[in-house]
């Protein structure tokens, strides 16, 4: 068995990579590892998205936790950032979110948070993994307890509402819940904000999460925004830790643009701590140039919101995120939060009194292409030293003449190598990306 924890916890197809036996072991091992570091009773919050497998995995995980004497509090269907927020609010020892984010319903995952609502550090995950891969967890005669929490949604939603600032209630908004976690919270949130909102894709059945809906499938949202002549469209992913938007014309406003809008607003109000925005190596070149033009320091990390957050904590920065819509507003949250992000943008939209398209136009997005090449798992550690791949990359970089960039990186959760190119012309970079992808596929493809 390979390494279980990826960049975003454990994830896989239910019944194959992720079984109830594994969930039981995760609960058992996590309770033992974290319990041995704490003198007080271990209290663990468990949330889940809307997948049919969520309840089964939550039950198995709960059994493992309780077998080590932990007190389990079931939050039910909530967004991932709700677990992160409530761990600290409820003074719990640990939080667990059962979700596979933007993946289809046959996938699920287990994400662990510490007592402050931060994702567990790699060292702690590695310690837990030793027990999952064979090391026996010491047994105990102490048995834990289980209870259902009926205040989680209200407590989380009220927290988001508290970050709103004079939002224009005349704004017409369409919200896509992706048949996921936001279905349980977004309608309540916008009702409390007193907004004119049309909510779509909220009637989940356990199988339709992310199915032609949400931040990975914006077509339906675009259609509704145009049809209803709405001011803005908002799309969440399956566990609502990311948010993408579309303007009044149905044009995408991605995570990079959201960060540009937010960081400039913070700078203008004197609140951009240490004058820095944190992105990743995958952030659009347009965001980097936007920061240069507006005298904002841009800090790039490895891909993954956990690495963005680590840099933010290390250097006391307050905003960071990814193009995919994972945006962290550190003054309010310890992880990416889709609903929080959407409220911050609505705050700015209301304050400026302009159309969403004008707000988003402050950043020029460079044409970008991303090709995912399916490869053998072991290839993710071999391609960098391959002479043919290196030659293909260098050839394309030379042709770009400094007006673009090439980035090749392995996926943290799947057997993929991602080929990303940015440049001035879409057709040109599409061809260049395919050249590199073809070389990788020929050498390392499945």
Which residues are covered by each model-predicted region?
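Short glycine-rich phosphate-binding loop at a beta-alpha junction
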Residues: 40-49, 73, 172-174, 275-281, ...
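Glycine-rich phosphate-binding loop
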Residues: 92-101, 107, 225-247, 252, ...
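Phosphate-binding and adjacent anionic-ligand microenvironments
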Residues: 269-446
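An N-terminal, well-structured beta->alpha segment
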Residues: 1-63, 67-68, 145-173, 380-381
């Amino acid at each position: 068995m390979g390494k279980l924890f990826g960049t975003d916890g454990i994830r896989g197809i239910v019944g194959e990579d992720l079984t109830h036996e594994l969930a039981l072991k995760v609960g058992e091992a996590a309770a033992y590892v974290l319990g041995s570091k704490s003198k007080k009773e271990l209290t663990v919050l468990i949330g889940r998205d809307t997948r049919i497998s969520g309840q089964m995995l939550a039950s198995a995980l709960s059994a493992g936790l309780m077998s080590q004497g932990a007190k389990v509090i079931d939050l039910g269907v909530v967004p991932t950032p709700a677990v992160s927020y409530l761990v600290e609010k409820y003074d719990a020892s640990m939080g667990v979110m059962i979700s596979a984010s933007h993946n289809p319903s046959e996938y699920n995952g287990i994400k662990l948070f510490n007592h402050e609502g931060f994702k567990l550090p790699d060292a702690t995950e590695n310690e837990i993994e030793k027990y999952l891969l064979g090391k026996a967890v010491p047994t105990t005669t102490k048995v834990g307890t289980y209870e259902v929490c009926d205040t989680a949604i209200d407590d989380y939603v009220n927290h988001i509402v508290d970050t709103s600032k004079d939002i224009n209630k005349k704004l017409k908004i369409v919200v896509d819940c992706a048949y996921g976690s936001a279905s349980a919270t977004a309608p309540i949130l916008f009702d409390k904000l007193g907004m004119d909102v049309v909510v779509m894709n909220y009637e989940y059945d356990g199988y339709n999460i992310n199915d032609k809906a949400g931040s990975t499938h914006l077509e339906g949202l675009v259609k509704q925004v145009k049809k209803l002549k709405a001011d803005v469209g908002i799309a969440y992913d399956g566990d609502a830790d990311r948010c993408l938007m579309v303007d009044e014309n149905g044009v995408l406003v991605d995570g990079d643009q959201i960060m540009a809008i937010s960081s400039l607003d913070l700078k203008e109000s004197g609140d951009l701590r240490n004058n820095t925005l944190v992105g990743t190596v995958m952030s659009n070149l347009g965001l980097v140039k936007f920061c240069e033009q507006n005298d904002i320091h841009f800090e790039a990390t490895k891909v993954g919101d956990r690495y963005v957050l680590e840099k933010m904590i290390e250097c006391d920065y307050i905003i960071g995120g990814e193009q995919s819509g994972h945006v962290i507003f550190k003054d309010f949250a310890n992880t990416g939060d889709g609903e929080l992000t959407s409220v911050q943008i609505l705050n700015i939209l209301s304050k400026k009194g302009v159309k969403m398209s004008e707000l988003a136009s402050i950043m020029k997005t460079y044409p970008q292409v991303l090709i995912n090449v399916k490869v053998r798992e072991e290839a993710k550690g071999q391609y960098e030293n391959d002479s043919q791949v290196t030659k293909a990359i260098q050839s394309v970089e030379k042709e770009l003449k400094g007006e673009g960039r090439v980035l090749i990186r392995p996926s943290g959760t799947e057997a993929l190598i991602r080929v990303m190119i940015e440049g001035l012309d879409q057709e040109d970079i599409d061809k260049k990306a395919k050249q590199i992808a073809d070389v990788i596929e020929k050498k390392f493809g499945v």
